[in-house]
């Protein structure tokens, strides 16, 4: 900061940038006094924008703390007492020690350091883009500034170019002050590019609107002239209006469509309106489209549905391997529907309220194909509606007819397309519905998926109730991240991931034959040796489903086709030895070092939208002051779990060793893959084990994984997603998994193959976790642990249900 005091010239609606000369008209007394003071001195003054341009008599609080040091180039007093001045901005300044002596404002300045973080290789490109976008802006504004553009092309300083352009733009005062406050020329140029792009987009939109309005006016005048001319010709010739034939056809179709009485009445009313209109008018087209949608809707067209349970079981077994629990639940559902149909509840005056199925599981486990199989088993039509990213309620309920280009909702559109009112409609990715100011599609689906209400579903476009109770809706999702009211209307059926042996059988029975067919390969031309599929699964996919497995087998088939076409071989045999030649280097390595015992390294288990995953937890302890650091993009619940685990371990170590000083150590806990968000409480025992290992310098078994929520007293609580987590442990070639004792009941759902591959140990307390986690070489340490027990508290506390990690 300099000691020199400069007069302040408050500016309204003007920001003076460095290296830019700006004309100013000054009429306020304090402003004129500031000009006079500058002229009597060094001709320099502080050019400071006001926070609110509407303030006529500003105070110091009304001024920004950022401005420009300016130099008066020229000044002239006008006859009305005002002053015209030409000022040049010199450089950015920060105001210090502001003062108001009633005559004028004054302040000291601190020069703002001009920085430039632009990479040298980007410099020329940024300059070119800035000038090009500015030229485009000037053209849109119909302003001629060839001389200014030539001047800019002669400047090689990004900061100066940005300031010059900003000075000639019509930005809001806040944006200009923001640009003035930015010391880094590179950041200033990036912000300016965004503002220029926004201005260009706004100008283009204005042009489109003007052109559209102009064209509409011309079109309306032309239509009016032609309609009047046609009427005159028809009157002279006495011919019938050609549109009459279309109206008669529409009337016949309305009567043939077997609409409900109230709907047919409304359709005929709209038809009468159409008769009174010119066929060329825009409103006539709106009514005609509306009537066509009413006619196309299958009001009374119901495809005969069959409920042959044996045939349904055959189709499900044909199309899907495994998933026995899922198939059984689907057959139960079809049996109930068959019984409802046999008792003909609708004719008895009641409505069958069969549940809506929601298939939940990771990608590639067969949710969509199960929907197709159900449709085939029941003899119904099938279609799917992709809900992922849907954010407009009108996509479900339809648009009001008053909107240009209005259409019915997706459900009505699908029913019109299929031509029957009892199809199977798959609502795909229901957990990925969005919502914004257009409404909430999930709320609109509440009526669609409620069997007690969907017989009177109202589509905004059709403006009438339609019966959706005959439609069999099946929803799919990767997670239970669905609104509670919507989830309450559906029965959830989980599709867990496949075991390795199940994937091998799926590949042999479905994927390999399908890839042979798609790539026109004979069985004798394309063979896969035993063991190859296992290598593909272990080294190239590692997923809960089989989607990537199909991609890799497809890659094998395509490369085989190429070799056959080149004439190098007459048949291709894929073996473990030549697999790398077809698929390249393995994406996942089976490294025995990962299974070695390490200090502070523990393998947890996570349950995600794509199935189970291994969760690596690393901890280190070093000299410090008892501070805890955790990294890896952890959610709030997981951070609380870490703090709980730390309290358990501190209590444990205090009880184990009275001389242990926790405040002499700092601890850093890290979960790798920091770009991936992680949350949930079920890694609690893994966190505690990692912390104890880091503090005690004792190694943890590398072939062991664990999952379970921990309480402050060391109790291990139940978790969710056990099957998915055990499948992940099997894929990771681990030998032992510690699970909460309360989850023992869930082992009945675990495939025998998984239980045979893993030693699954139930634990109820952190003592038991430590007993199994630390390697046998540290038996003395384990013995000391066994002799101690955590202090207990007599009060009984209710624990919340475990979440999932």
UniProtKB/Swiss-Prot annotation:
Induction line: By heat shock.
EC identifiers of the protein: 3.4.21.53
Gene Ontology molecular functions: ATP binding; ATP hydrolysis activity; ATP-dependent peptidase activity; sequence-specific DNA binding; serine-type endopeptidase activity
Keywords: ATP-binding, Cytoplasm, Hydrolase, Nucleotide-binding, Protease, Serine protease, Stress response
GO BP term (any one): cellular response to heat
Sites where the protein binds ATP: 361-368
PROSITE patterns: LON_N, LON_PROTEOLYTIC, LON_SER
Main location group: cytoplasm
GO cellular component: cytoplasm
Residues at the catalytic site: 682, 725
Coiled coil: none
Stretches assigned to the Lon proteolytic domain: 596-776
InterPro entries per record: AAA+_ATPase, ATPase_AAA_core, Lon_bac, Lon_bac/euk-typ, Lon_lid, Lon_proteolytic, Lon_Prtase, Lon_prtase_N
Localization (cell): Cytoplasm
Reactions mediated catalytically: Hydrolysis of proteins in presence of ATP
SMART domains cross-referenced by the UniProt entry: AAA, LON
Function (record text): ATP-dependent serine protease that mediates the selective degradation of mutant and abnormal proteins as well as certain short-lived regulatory proteins. Required for cellular homeostasis and for survival from DNA damage and developmental changes induced by stress. Degrades polypeptides processively to yield small peptide fragments that are 5 to 10 amino acids long. Binds to DNA in a double-stranded, site-specific manner.
Similarity comment: Belongs to the peptidase S16 family.
Subunit structure: Homohexamer. Organized in a ring with a central cavity.
Protein name per the record: Lon protease
Record lineage: Bacteria, Pseudomonadati, Pseudomonadota, Gammaproteobacteria, Cardiobacteriales
């Amino acid at each position: 900061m300099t000691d020199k005091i400069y007069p302040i010239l408050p500016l309204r609606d003007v920001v003076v940038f460095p290296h830019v000369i700006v004309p100013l008209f000054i009429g306020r007394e304090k402003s004129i006094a500031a000009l006079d003071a500058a002229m009597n001195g060094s001709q320099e003054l502080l050019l400071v924008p006001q926070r609110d341009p509407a303030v006529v008599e500003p105070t110091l609080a009304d001024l920004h703390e950022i401005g420009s040091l300016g130099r008066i180039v020229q000044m002239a007093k006008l006859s009305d007492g005002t002053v015209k001045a030409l000022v040049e901005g010199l450089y950015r300044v920060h105001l210090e020690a502001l003062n108001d002596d009633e005559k004028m404002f004054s302040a000291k300045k601190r020069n703002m350091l001009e920085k430039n973080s632009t990479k040298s290789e980007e410099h020329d490109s940024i300059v070119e883009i800035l000038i090009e976008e500015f030229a485009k802006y000037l053209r849109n504004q119909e302003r001629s500034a060839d001389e200014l553009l030539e001047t800019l092309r002669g400047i090689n300083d990004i900061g100066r170019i940005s300031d010059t352009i900003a000075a000639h733009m019509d930005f809001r005062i806040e944006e200009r002050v923001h640009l003035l406050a930015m010391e880094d020329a590179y950041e200033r140029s990036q912000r300016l590019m965004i503002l220029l792009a926004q201005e260009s987009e706004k100008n283009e939109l204005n042009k489109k609107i003007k052109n559209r309005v102009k064209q509409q006016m011309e079109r309306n005048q032309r239509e009016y002239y032609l309609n009047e001319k046609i009427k005159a010709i028809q009157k002279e010739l006495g011919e019938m209006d050609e549109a009459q034939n279309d109206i008669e056809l529409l009337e016949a179709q309305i009567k043939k469509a077997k609409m409900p009485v109230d709907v047919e009445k409304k359709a005929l009313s709209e038809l009468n309106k159409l008769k009174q209109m010119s066929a060329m008018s825009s409103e006539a087209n709106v009514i005609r489209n509306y009537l066509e949608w009413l006619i196309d809707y299958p009001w009374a067209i119901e495809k005969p549905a069959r409920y042959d349970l044996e045939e349904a079981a055959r189709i499900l077994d044909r199309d899907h391997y495994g998933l026995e629990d899922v198939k059984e639940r689907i057959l139960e559902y079809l049996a109930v529907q068959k019984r409802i149909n046999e008792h003909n509840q609708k004719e008895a005056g009641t409505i069958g309220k069969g549940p809506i199925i929601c298939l939940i599981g990771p990608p590639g486990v067969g949710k969509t194909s199960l929907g197709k199989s159900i449709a085939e088993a029941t003899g119904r039509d099938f279609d799917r509606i992709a809900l992922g990213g849907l954010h407009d309620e009108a996509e479900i309920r339809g648009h009001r007819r008053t909107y240009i280009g209005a259409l019915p909702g997706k459900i009505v559109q699908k029913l019109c397309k299929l031509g029957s009112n009892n199809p199977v409609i798959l609502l795909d990715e229901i957990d990925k519905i969005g919502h914004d100011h257009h409404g909430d599609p999930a709320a609109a689906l509440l009526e669609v998926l409620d069997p007690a209400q969907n017989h009177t579903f109202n589509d905004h476009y059709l403006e009438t109730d339609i019966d959706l109770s005959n439609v069999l809706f099946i929803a799919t999702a990767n997670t239970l991240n669905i609104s509670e009211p919507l989830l309450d209307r559906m029965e959830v059926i989980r599709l867990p991931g496949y075991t390795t042996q199940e994937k091998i059988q799926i590949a042999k029975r479905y994927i390999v034959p399908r890839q042979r067919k798609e790539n026109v390969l004979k069985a004798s031309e394309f063979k896969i040796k035993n063991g190859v599929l296992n290598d593909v699964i272990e080294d190239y996919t590692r997923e809960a489903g089989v989607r990537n497995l199909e991609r890799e087998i497809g890659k094998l088939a395509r490369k085989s086709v190429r070799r056959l076409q080149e004439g190098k071989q007459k048949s291709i045999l894929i073996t473990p030895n030549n697999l790398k030649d077809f698929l390249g280097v393995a994406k996942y390595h089976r490294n025995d070092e990962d299974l070695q015992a390490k200090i502070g390294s523990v393998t947890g288990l996570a349950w995600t939208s794509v199935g189970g995953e291994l969760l690596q937890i690393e901890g280190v302890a070093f000299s410090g002051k008892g501070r805890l650091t955790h990294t890896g993009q952890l959610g709030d619940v997981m951070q609380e779990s870490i703090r709980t685990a730390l309290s358990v371990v501190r209590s444990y170590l205090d009880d184990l060793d009275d001389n242990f000083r926790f405040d002499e150590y700092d601890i850093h806990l890290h979960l790798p893959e920091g770009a991936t968000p992680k949350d949930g409480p079920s890694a609690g025992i893994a966190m505690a084990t990692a912390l104890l290992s880091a503090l005690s310098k004792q190694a943890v078994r590398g072939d062991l994984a664990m999952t379970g929520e921990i309480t402050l007293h060391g109790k291990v609580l139940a978790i969710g997603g056990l099957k998915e987590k055990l499948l992940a442990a099997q894929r990771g070639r681990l030998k032992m998994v510690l699970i909460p004792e309360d989850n023992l009941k869930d082992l009945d759902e675990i495939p025998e193959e998984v239980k045979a591959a893993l030693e699954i140990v139930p634990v109820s307390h952190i003592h038991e976790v430590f007993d199994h986690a630390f390697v046998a070489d540290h038996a003395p340490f384990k013995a000391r642990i066994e002799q101690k027990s955590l202090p207990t508290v007599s009060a009984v506390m209710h624990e919340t249900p475990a979440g999932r990690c």
